[in-house]
Amino acid sequence: MSSGCLLLLLGLLTLWAELTPISGLGGPKYCHLPADPGPCSNYRPAYYYNPASRKCEEFMYGGCKGNKNNFKTRHECHRVCVR
């Protein structure tokens, strides 16, 4: 391979690396909201995406209001927020 081809390949790889989202950063903006149990007290386990750990984690949801970073299963949280 000529040096020109190698430079082109290196440039394309660099561009690809810059444009490829880091896992978890490609999801909806609400995936970066904090866990919000809401004002009610009908507590049940739920899952939210934690951008600091880049994982879906369990929290206790009160059953009403809160925000959209709230999923019934870890699988659903992962499907929506981890990319």
Swiss-Prot record:
The keyword Disulfide bond applies. Keywords: Disulfide bond, Protease inhibitor, Secreted, Serine protease inhibitor, Signal, Toxin. Its main location: secreted. Residues 31-81 form the BPTI/Kunitz inhibitor domain. Residues 1-24 form the signal peptide. GO terms for molecular function: serine-type endopeptidase inhibitor activity; toxin activity. Expressed by the venom gland. Disulfide bonds join 31-81, 40-64, 56-77. It is found in: Secreted. GO terms for cellular component: extracellular space. It holds the Pfam family Kunitz_BPTI. Snake venom serine protease inhibitor. Belongs to the venom Kunitz-type family. This is Protease inhibitor 4. It comes from Walterinnesia aegyptia (Desert black snake).
